Amino acid sequence: MERYDNAFTELKARKEGAFVPFVTLGDPGPEQSLKIIDTLIAAGADALELGIPFSDPLADGPTIQSATLRAFASGVTPTQCFEMLATVRQKYPTIPIGLLMYANLVFNRGIDEFYAECARVGVDSVLIADVPIEESAPFRQAAMRHNIAPIFICPPNADDELLRQIASHGRGYTYLLSRAGVTGAENKAAVPLHHLVEKLAEYHAAPPLQGFGISSPEQVTAAIEANAAGAISGSAIVKIIEKNVDKPDQMLTELRDFVTVMKAATRHA
């Protein structure tokens, strides 16, 4: 959990926002997946948001669903994902690593066992996409027992009560939704969410990172101008993987170029 605090403190000192890429672990295969993560970090990613492949990803648009299918096709299992996470953590001791996933995967291992495993491999946060905050108690309690930050989604239409709950129960960062719906670069992020960012700050919530539909440097700049602590980009990155499945070197080059440009947009003029 401390890795998020340290990262945000350092970024603030450098007058930068965070750029956080999302990829599915094991897409398009375990070996290339680790090379992708190396490339994202080398190009300037400030934290990682990683998915564990799941057979029924409700909140994901078609791009990330196909990433999941590619990972499945390469034979990736949740156990293998944890091994990959341990490898990444060993290589990069300070970068914050978050998981974005679904409750079924947690139930399959047992809630406490799942968070214990996260702690063992060096995961910092877990966002469970299909568990609303009012049903989150067993998950967040297990998370806190194992020093894992429970992450909550703040939707664009959040009322004061929800904002208070998010501030009270969330740690690490707050996932600020650009809009309701499923993920994807197909749907452009809407207007910057000044109002929500101000409210979250008023309730002392964890720093907000804006996600959903972030695919251009202009959107990153807009998120930071709205006082978000940074931006998360998933579908745009996964599209680069998809487009270059048969060209692994080209894939890494394009990912590096994309992350470099997106990271540059986090630097305040």
UniProtKB/Swiss-Prot annotation:
GO molecular function: tryptophan synthase activity
Name of the protein: Tryptophan synthase alpha chain
Its EC number(s): 4.2.1.20
Source species: Enterobacter sp. (strain 638)
Pathways involved: Amino-acid biosynthesis; L-tryptophan biosynthesis; L-tryptophan from chorismate: step 5/5
EC supergroup of this enzyme: lyase
SUPFAM superfamilies membership: Ribulose-phoshate binding barrel (SSF51366)
Membership in a protein family: Belongs to the TrpA family.
Entry keyword Amino-acid biosynthesis: yes
Catalysed reactions, semicolon-separated: (1S,2R)-1-C-(indol-3-yl)glycerol 3-phosphate + L-serine = D-glyceraldehyde 3-phosphate + L-tryptophan + H2O
Superkingdom per UniProt: Bacteria
